[in-house]
Regions:
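Non-globular, low-confidence helical/coil segments that flank catalytic cores
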Residues: 2-258
Length: 258
């Protein structure tokens, strides 16, 4: 019995030693191998958690500096439970809240986020849905938050910590004209989504919001090979209306997330 206990003890020592060695590896080479926890992309010091909340969409980006960006808030207060699985209970700050577009399954939980967290920057595409009670409540909560409000109305490149965030769309004021440039057909809210590419070291992630094929075609024409990415967050939850063969060929991702 004592020999068995000794063997088990030695096995545990070896396992913990290996874990310690892995954690102490400070190499700058980005590793896109499958993470230990499903629903995450881990690129050295950059971590993206794709939150499992049933209906809706939400992702938490944790930058190498420790700053955090929440991309969309799902449909309701379940976002708080989902964040509780990836954030410390004592963390009441979110540096950036980015709402890609005003579909309820993307902004519905934002009012709960604004009640629970101190949000420093709010990023939005500017599309208004006056007369919609849910959107009106969301908009009122945004106005009451003491945060820096950023409305995306042009292509921009931001530096956050040591990452580059290239905002690809909207590249014009959605308030003035929500249609895709060069087209006259009316678009729904999905094709007003904020689309951005996040690059860190030699790897990149492309976030498509709810972009459907008409917006994908415009992005392909406008940006071409700039859309190439290692990981793509598929548009419109991976539905048939998005992620055309042309887009996937151009982006040539190693991994995709619906």
């Amino acid at each position: 019995m004592k020999k068995l206990q000794l063997v088990l003890f030695l096995v545990l020592v070896i396992i913990f030693g290996m874990l310690f060695f892995v954690k102490k590896d400070n190499s700058n080479n980005v590793d896109l191998s499958k993470p230990e926890v499903a629903g995450e992309s881990i690129l050295a010091g950059l971590k993206v958690s794709y939150l499992d909340i049933g209906q809706g969409d939400a992702s938490l980006i944790e930058f190498p500096s420790g700053e955090q960006m929440l991309v969309d808030c799902a449909i309701d207060g379940r976002i708080l439970e989902a964040l509780g699985r990836v954030m410390p209970y004592y963390d009441h700050d979110i540096d950036y809240l980015l709402i890609t577009h005003p579909d309820l399954d993307h902004y519905g939980g934002c009012t709960e986020i604004l009640k629970r967290f101190d949000v420093k920057n709010i990023i939005y595409n500017g599309l208004e849905k006056r007369g919609d009670a849910m959107w009106e409540a969301f908009w009122q909560a945004l106005q009451e938050e003491n945060a820096n409000y950023i409305e995306i109305d042009k292509e921009e490149v931001w530096q956050i910590a040591s990452t580059t965030m290239h905002i690809l769309y909207p590249d014009h004021s959605i308030k003035q004209n929500k249609n895709i440039p060069g087209t006259s057909s009316e678009v729904n809210a999905n094709d007003t989504s904020i689309v951005f590419k996040l690059s860190y070291l030699d790897k990149s992630l492309l976030f498509m919001g709810d972009a459907e094929e008409p917006l994908e075609e415009y992005l392909l024409t406008t940006y071409g090979e700039q859309l190439d990415a290692d990981v793509i967050k598929l548009g419109h939850h991976g539905s048939d209306s998005s992620s055309s063969e042309e887009l996937l060929t151009m982006t040539s991702p190693t991994d995709s997330v619906a």
